[in-house]
Amino acid sequence: MSVLFEPVTLGELKLANRIVMAPMTRSRALADAIPGSDMVEYYRQRAGAGLIIAEGTAPSACGLGYCRTPAIYSAEQIAGWQRVTEAVHAEGGRIVLQLMHVGRAASQHNKPAGAATVAPSALRANTQVFSDSHGLVDTDEPQALTAQGIQEVIEHYRQAALNARKAGFDGVELHCTSGYLPMQFMASGSNRRNDAYGGDAAGRVRFAKEVIEAMAGAIGAGRVGFRLCPGNPYNDIDDLEPAQTAAALCEAVAPLPLAYLHIMRSPLQGLDAFELARQHSPHALILNDSFDGPSANAALASGEGAAVSFGRHFIANPDLVERLRHGRALSRFDRKTLYTPGKAGYTDYPTWQAVAQEVAQ
């Protein structure tokens, strides 16, 4: 049998197979960053994955910055997510929540009134974000976090992990790449601090380390994972030593019995992120590298990691696990509907069986 379909345990997470649905922003949350019925159906359809990592979700109002993205700091948001987790669990699935604080990669047009845009240093990201009200806009000029502000953000993450468990999630993942707040602290280009949270790699990874420690202390380390992509330049990230930075974080959290490290292939030539992770992290690896079925199985069979994650393939193939199991053709997603409101391009992709039945008729 293909290794892909063997069960695996990651910390406290028992997976029926080694196929993980990667977290993907889809911009379908309702007003006030509340998950709605379309999100319930979307995740329910994909519950065949051994593990779903639900989309990046703000731990606080300050953590928001994109349009129609969810959060988990209010009672209404927790209730919305609870409907999602109940639907996934009813199908026999497992689901964790990716916590994503966008930091400076934000626009006030996408935030509640009074929610500040913060960063390790007062340096604006040279990029734009979309807003429903104003279209493409420049990112905000961020406020540099004070020492007290850093502790407040860490507490927001800790409480968000507790809220996630209250909502029924099996665990949480810290988003440490794509130019969001943890990565802004980690990268030398966006972190110009001269205190304990800046300077060398050990200082720059301290924020992410303390967030992971806080979440592990709140819900148990075996229910916490983190995601890395060394050298990812997205959202105007520049780091002079991406390999050393990633290694420093892996080593800093190595004493914690975390569930997993979700490691993405680096876009930088000569930087083998998977090998770096194996050398510097004791944690089980979820690999992400634009896999198809055969390449994913080969990676697992060779011992490169414990599981593999798929992103794009899960968009248009809600039954991806069964398609891979039986070698069936994969549908292609419509790029135009990736971030548009409503069911189109979200919950209306048919299963292979549904297509076959329609053809037969």
Kindly give the residue locations of the regions a language model identified:
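Flavin-dependent oxidoreductase catalytic cores
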Residues: 1-361
